[in-house]
Amino acid sequence: MAAESSLRVATPTLCNLNGSQRRPTTTTLSPLRFMGFRPRPSSHSLTSSSLSHFFGSTRIHSNSSSSYSSISRQHAPRRNFSVFAMSADDAKRSVPLKDYRNIGIMAHIDAGKTTTTERILYYTGRNYKIGEVHEGTATMDWMEQEQERGITITSAATTTFWNKHRINIIDTPGHVDFTLEVERALRVLDGAICLFDSVAGVEPQSETVWRQADKYGVPRICFVNKMDRLGANFYRTRDMIVTNLGAKPLVIQLPIGSEDNFKGVIDLVRNKAIVWSGEELGAKFDIVDIPEDLQEQAQDYRAQMIENIVEFDDQAMENYLEGIEPDEETIKKLIRKGTISASFVPVMCGSAFKNKGVQPLLDAVVDYLPSPLDLPAMKGSDPENPEATIERLASDDEPFAGLAFKIMSDPFVGSLTFVRVYAGKLGAGSYVLNANKGKKERIGRLLEMHANSRDDVKVALAGDIIALAGLKDTITGETLCDPDNPIVLERMDFPDPVIKVAIEPKTKADVDKMATGLIKLAQEDPSFHFSRDEEINQTVIEGMGELHLEIIVDRLKREFKVEANVGAPQVNYRESISKISEVKYVHKKQSGGQGQFADITVRFEPMDPGSGYEFKSEIKGGAVPREYIPGVMKGLEECMSNGVLAGFPVVDVRAVLTDGSYHDVDSSVLAFQLAARGAFREGIRKAGPRMLEPIMKVEVVTPEEHLGDVIGDLNSRRGQINSFGDKPGGLKVVDSLVPLAEMFQYVSTLRGMTKGRASYTMQLAMFDVVPQHIQNQLATKEQEVAA
C-alpha cells in the first residue's frame, strides 16, 4: 500500500509515461492522486510493534468442447478436467498464443454476469454442474458475503477451453461500490462481453463500465440477456446502446420469440435458426431453417449486417455491389476486423438462466474478440529515462514484462499477486524486478486460479493471467519485469473514496488484530483507505459507498475475528479555488548559528473539474536554484491534503512558482519547503476558496402511483430532476442529481414511501460547489473539533 497510501505529485515529466497503445497517452494529471484525505501513513511502516501506537490504546483442455457450427444436432460433451495449457516442458505451449482470449464479463448489477459465467464453465467442461447465484452455489462468487447477498463483490479469475482456444475469464462486480474491480480487470484484458438485461436495457452502471472499456480501448461484444423475462425487448435494448452509449451496434442474432415463448436465436452469419429444447440443461440444441414468419425480418437485418462489414474489405465491397454476398468465413473475418478496431459492437441475445444462447456466445468470443497478437505492442517507459518509450511484443521470446493488477489474501498460501503476462516467460523460483520501486522479488509459486481454488504451474507464458505467491513489496498497478530489461507499464487510476466512517475495536485486545486486518484489506483494495485522526482520536475508514464499507467491516469480523463499533457515515468533501491569486512569501528565521531563508512567489490558478493538482515552475535565471525547487514542490504537496476552510483535500489547483530569491548560506531545501507552506495558506485564502461535495447520479424506478412522493422527496434532498422515462409494467424512471450528503439511509425512506415496490441506483457523477450556508456549518464544525 505504500505507494497508494501516499500523495503523489505529477509533474510534466512524470505525466508522459506511456502505456498500452490502445489507450491514448495523456499529459493531463490524474485528480485521483491528490484527493486523499489527511495524509495516510504507509501501511508498510505499520510494523507489529507500532500497531498499538497507531490505533491508540484508549479503546484441462477438452477437445470435445466444440462450436455449434460443426453439426446440425448438437450435444456438447462435458467433462471435468485438470490439464491446463502449461505443459511439463517449460519452453513449449499446448495452446498457441493466437488461440488465447483474455476476456471480462461486465454489466450493471443483476444483468446476469455470474450466471452467464457459470454456464460457460459448465458447457466448456470446467465445472460438472451449474452453480446458481440465488442458491449461493456459484463457483465465481466464492466469498461468504457474495453467497449470502447474491452479488459479486470481488473480481474472480478462471481459465477454460472452447473449440481448442484457451479462454481466461474475469467475472466482475456490477455494483457501483466495487467499480475498482472492473477498472483493474479491463486494464489487463484484451476483450469483453457486455451484458444487458433485456427488460431494463442500458442501466446506469452499464454506462459506467462501458466508459471504462472505452478508456482502455477494449474491444467488446454485447449479449442481451434474460430474453425469457416478462417485458423483454431486444430491439429497445439495441436502440439504447445507440442513444445511451453512443456505440454502433451490429446485430448478428435475432431472438425467436420472447418472454415465455423465447425458444432460440436466428444466426444471421449462417442464416440459420438455433433452437434449444430444454434438454440436457441446454447442452442440446437444433440448427434448423429460419421460421417462415421471421424470414423477411432476418433478410433485412442480414442485409444491414453485410452492408456494414463489407466496408472493411475492398474486394468484398466490389463483390457485394455486383450482387455476390460474402461467404460465412469472410463474414466472420470482417466482423472480427470491425470488432477489434471498435468500429462496431456485435450484438447477440439469449437467456443464460434458461440455458439458451451461451454456446453461440462462446463461439463469438473465439471468432470476434482479439488474441494478444491482434493488439498493438505494449508500450512502457524506461525507469531511468521516463520520456523514452519501450515496446514489448506479445511473444515468449521477448524479455518478461507483466502488470500486477490485484492482491488477494489466501488463508492457505498467503498474499497472492495477480499478474497479466504481456511478454516473455516466468518460472517459479525466478527473480523479477519491480520496476516502479527498483526492487528485486523472488517468485515463490506460480498458481493458476479458478475462483478461490488454485493449481500450481511451472511456468507462465505471454498472454497468461497468473497468481504469484511470495511477493512482498509489489502492489496493485506496479510492473514486474526482467531485471536486465526494465520497463514501466502504465499504471491504473484508482477511484478516490467518497464516504468515510469512524471505527474502533470493541475490546482493547483487538487493536492489533484490527490494524493487521485493515492493512491487508487496504493492500487488496486501493479504493479503500484508512487513517488515524489524532485530532479526534479515531481511526477512519474510507470507501466508495455504504455497501463497500459494510463489506469491509463484515470481513474484519469474519476473516480477522474483530468486532468493531462503527460511527455514522460522513461525506468526503473537497476544497478548491475560484480565482487566480499570486502571493509573495518570505520565510526568515535567525536564532544563532545558521539561519533559514527562502523567498518565493507562487501563483495559484483554478483548473477544470477533475484535474487534480499540478505544479509548474517558471523560474528563470536561477532566481530559485534548481536544487531548492523540490522543497517548494514538497511543501505545497503536503498542504494539498489539508485545505484552509475545513481541512479537506484541495483539488483542481495549479501552483506556479514564478519568482524568488535565496541566501548563499541560510537557504536550504527545508527553508523553501516551509516557505511553500506559508505561501499556500496565504495564496489559497486570497483565491476565493470554496468547498465541493460529491454529487450522485440517482435513478429511481417506481410505480406511477408513487411518482409524486418520490419526486418530492428528491427535491427535499437538494435534488435536481433531470428527466423521466417509462419502463414495462407501468413503472416510471426518475433520473436526478442529488448530493451524497442527502442520500444516507435513502433505501429505507424509499421502501417506506413505495411499500417496497421501488428501487434505485446511485453512482458518483461529479463534485460541485457546496451551498454557502452548508459550507459555513461544515467550517464551524471543523473548528469546534480542532478546538
Curated annotation (Swiss-Prot):
Family membership: Belongs to the TRAFAC class translation factor GTPase superfamily. Classic translation factor GTPase family. EF-G/EF-2 subfamily.
Top-level taxon of the source organism: Eukaryota
Natural source organism: Glycine max
PROSITE patterns, alphabetized: G_TR_1, G_TR_2
Predominant localisation class: plastid
Annotated region (Disordered), positions in chain: 14-34
Protein name, per record: Elongation factor G-1, chloroplastic
GO biological process, one term: ribosome disassembly
Composition bias, Polar residues: 14-24
Keyword entries, A-Z: Chloroplast, Elongation factor, GTP-binding, Nucleotide-binding, Plastid, Protein biosynthesis, Transit peptide
Matching CDD domains: EF-G, EFG_III, EFG_mtEFG1_IV, EFG_mtEFG_C, EFG_mtEFG_II
Pfam families: EFG_C (PF00679), EFG_III (PF14492), EFG_IV (PF03764), GTP_EFTU (PF00009), GTP_EFTU_D2 (PF03144)
Subcellular location: Plastid, Chloroplast
Biological or metabolic pathway of the protein: Protein biosynthesis; polypeptide chain elongation
Domain tr-type G: start-end pairs: 98-373
NCBIfam families per UniProt: EF-G (TIGR00484), PRK12740.1-3 (NF009379), PRK12740.1-5 (NF009381), small_GTP (TIGR00231)
GO terms for cellular component: chloroplast
